[in-house]
């Protein structure tokens, strides 16, 4: 807010025409606050926009970033005693492992820059019984939305393969995160030059 107030005073002093706004973004890292602002028309009349993020490290001008998609996956099976009658069960944990293995092998067919991570949320705690429920999360990121969409189809095939191979059922939901950032190098260079002029240490790059 202080920088915004100073900017307005500078515009008055040097007779710079235009409108300057300071826009706060709630829950922007986890739930896409900027996306909601964009859909709400907040940036419709904006010619240039600069995002500034606080850091505990040395300042830097950010470059490109990946766009992403996040999945919540739930496998449902049939519980049974793991030692007495395991054949009576349908192991949701095995379905999850099958999914993870399929994704791991699928990575070989993805383009450079694709990143995939996954983990258990529920259903991995107990032993001694065939697990009838497992919940997972899976995140993927790629340089462009088109690559994300291509990888999503492959990931969903892996998710469904886990269910098909074990006789379980599966529910999953994939939600797009932010799209990739396209940096403005001219604006970034001006920002860097002004930071250096004010004595602010800057990381290279």
Predicted segments with their positions:
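Metal-dependent amide/peptide-bond hydrolase catalytic core
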Residues: 93-205
């Amino acid at each position: 807010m202080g920088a915004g107030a100073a900017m307005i005073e500078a515009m008055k002093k040097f007779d710079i025409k235009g409108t300057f706004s300071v826009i706060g973004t709630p829950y922007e890292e986890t739930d896409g606050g900027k996306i909601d602002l964009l859909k709400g028309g907040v940036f419709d009349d904006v010619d240039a926009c600069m995002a500034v993020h606080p850091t505990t490290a040395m300042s830097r001008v950010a470059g490109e970033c990946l766009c992403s998609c996040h999945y919540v996956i739930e496998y449902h099976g049939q519980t049974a005693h793991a030692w007495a009658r395991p054949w009576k069960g349908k192991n949701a944990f095995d379905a999850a492992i099958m999914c993870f293995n399929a994704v791991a092998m699928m990575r070989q067919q993805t383009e450079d820059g694709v990143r995939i991570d996954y983990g258990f949320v529920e259903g991995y705690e107990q032993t001694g019984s065939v697990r009838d429920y497992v919940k997972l999360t899976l995140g993927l990121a790629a340089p462009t939305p088109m690559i994300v969409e291509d990888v999503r189809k492959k990931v969903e095939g892996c998710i469904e393969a886990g269910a098909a191979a074990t006789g379980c059922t599966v529910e999953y939901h994939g939600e797009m995160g932010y799209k990739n950032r396209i940096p403005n190098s001219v604006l970034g260079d001006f920002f860097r030059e002004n930071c250096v002029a004010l004595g602010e240490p800057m990381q290279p790059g």
